[in-house]
Amino acid sequence: MKLMTMPSEFQKALPILTKIKEAGYEAYFVGGSVRDVLLERPIHDVDIATSSYPEETKAIFNRTVDVGIEHGTVLVLENGGEYEITTFRTEDVYVDYRRPSQVSFVRSLEEDLKRRDFTVNALALDENGQVIDKFRGLIDLEQKRLRAVGKAEERFEEDALRIMRGFRFAASLDFDIEAATFEAMRSHSPLLEKISVERSFTEFDKLLMAPHWRKGISAMIACQAYDYLPGLKQQEAGLNHLIVSLKDNFTFSDHHQAWAYVMISLAIEDPKSFLKAWKTSNDFQRYVTKLIALYRIRQERSFEKLDIYQYGKEMASLVEGLRKAQSLSVDMDHIEALDQALAIHNKYDIVLNGSHLIKDFGMKPGPQLGLMLEKVELAIVEGRLDNDFTTIEAFVREELAT
């Protein structure tokens, strides 16, 4: 197969391939970018593989950076762009089902492609637009099928994260997993416990944000892979609820919304501990935990002005997005009106602060001062007090007198 026209991302990188070829080596576009071009999807990263060894690659170009030279990768700075160029390589026995014990550089494109996970990711493209397909990846692309390169059992024993990648690709590409590949994923799912939680989180997160995320979750359920992921053991019912409880065409707006609804579906009692088990950041934990709290408030009643002040319009909109997907009542205009009606959006908008209370009222730093500032803040938010210096002073004077 030959591409009639190269996408602009590849055209810009063609001089890189030409330079390598002129130096006497092979060079190709490889991996997901080739797959996405053939599927007419946007390209995110342009990866180049070459028969030149790292030191040989560095000798060809004036500006390079060693970004992963032990794995054969050199970053080339050329024509205003940055390109990762990786030497063809083979990988020795994998350690802990996660990483190869040794990487060996080779001159053969086929040897390089055969170590990849799925046939649709094992395609290469030369400078003339000719697709090199050593493992029937083009047929799999046409039939929307995800199939492991070579023996599926070996691929998942080498790196068990490929199981999670399989679920993610099913979700992002809307592909079905080939039977033998699926069976190997199912039988090797216990190996997911050997994988770092951070790597599993990244794949699961991408799955949730994919347009066909239900397909990925369904495959995970069928493989019983969830039993080997943090907080998901024996959660088949909750995961099924996740799939069926939202409208068919719904996709999550952002990562926080996705993980919040996962925990809502699973009826997780301690969201922060659940997210800690996934080794997420403290900021992520705080935001998602607040989002779940706001969702539960909204299930009981309509939003009030204080809700929008404390949680923010953006978070309230994420909650309404989930409610809409559940065919529940939503009122985005109400959220907007409440936000517009707020005299302040945070405590720093208040014209009077703690220093004024200390100076003008002789208050001392401590709990009493903090409590007074909270009273002022709440009164302004609820509309009982104008954000005006004189008015606030009168309010404080009255509070101190009681």
Swiss-Prot record:
Quaternary structure, from the entry: Homodimer.
Note: A single active site specifically recognizes both ATP and CTP and is responsible for their addition.
InterPro entries: Bact_CCA-adding_enz_type3_sf, CCA-adding_enz_C, CCA-adding_enz_firmicutes, NT_sf, PolA_pol_head_dom, PolyA_RNA-bd
Similarity section: Belongs to the tRNA nucleotidyltransferase/poly(A) polymerase family. Bacterial CCA-adding enzyme type 3 subfamily.
Residues annotated to bind CTP: G32, R35, R116, D159, R162, R165, R168
Annotated residues for binding of ATP: G32, R35, R116, D159, R162, R165, R168
Pfam families documented for this protein: PolyA_pol, PolyA_pol_RNAbd, tRNA_NucTran2_2
Highest taxon in the source lineage: Bacteria
EC category: transferase
Listed GO MF terms: ATP binding; CCA tRNA nucleotidyltransferase activity; magnesium ion binding; tRNA binding
Gene this protein is translated from: cca
Enzyme Commission code: 2.7.7.72
Record's function text: Catalyzes the addition and repair of the essential 3'-terminal CCA sequence in tRNAs without using a nucleic acid template. Adds these three nucleotides in the order of C, C, and A to the tRNA nucleotide-73, using CTP and ATP as substrates and producing inorganic pyrophosphate. tRNA 3'-terminal CCA addition is required both for tRNA processing and repair. Also involved in tRNA surveillance by mediating tandem CCA addition to generate a CCACCA at the 3' terminus of unstable tRNAs. While stable tRNAs receive only 3'-terminal CCA, unstable tRNAs are marked with CCACCA and rapidly degraded.
Keyword terms: ATP-binding, Magnesium, Metal-binding, Nucleotide-binding, Nucleotidyltransferase, RNA repair, RNA-binding, Transferase, tRNA processing
Binding-site residues for Mg(2+), renumbered to this chain: D45, D47
PANTHER family listed in its UniProt record: CCA TRNA NUCLEOTIDYLTRANSFERASE 1, MITOCHONDRIAL
Recorded catalytic activity of this chain's protein: a tRNA precursor + 2 CTP + ATP = a tRNA with a 3' CCA end + 3 diphosphate; a tRNA with a 3' CCA end + 2 CTP + ATP = a tRNA with a 3' CCACCA end + 3 diphosphate
GO biological process, one term: RNA repair
Coiled-coil residue windows: none
Listed cofactors: Mg(2+)
Organism annotation: Streptococcus pyogenes serotype M3 (strain ATCC BAA-595 / MGAS315)
Name of the protein this chain belongs to: CCA-adding enzyme
